[in-house]
């Protein structure tokens, strides 16, 4: 059983398409964001190599208004203890506030976080805004941004610097063609 809690736009919601695309075991809980479209990204690619040329975002990335934030937080708080695993995919588009993070940290049995730094949030969405998690998965540039370190060896950066910023016993950092590097408290780095 899987439940998804998300915000969709008040207009251009694509809610029908989203609901039709879900597997039968997935329940969608929607909070509608006022005066906003559903976040959508269109990529323009060069054929035949499918190389991304540019992308256009349709979204509102300011924080949710107070009423919508309260609805979202209540929905999460009401459901979080029912599940063995909470997976947060935070794209930095204004949905997840400090109050939401507090609920996630206190209520989750196991909290897995992916907080993305991307061209739309300009690096303002660092994984360090989650001081406590059971597992985080980010890419190497996101790990570097999180600890403001462009040059250190990635293994040192993860095992010494990132672990000082986030209380998290399990970390995976994807590293492009090199695969990924994992850290587990007590076992250290595995690459």
Residue ranges, per PLM feature:
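Ribokinase/PfkB-type carbohydrate-kinase core domain
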Residues: 1-191
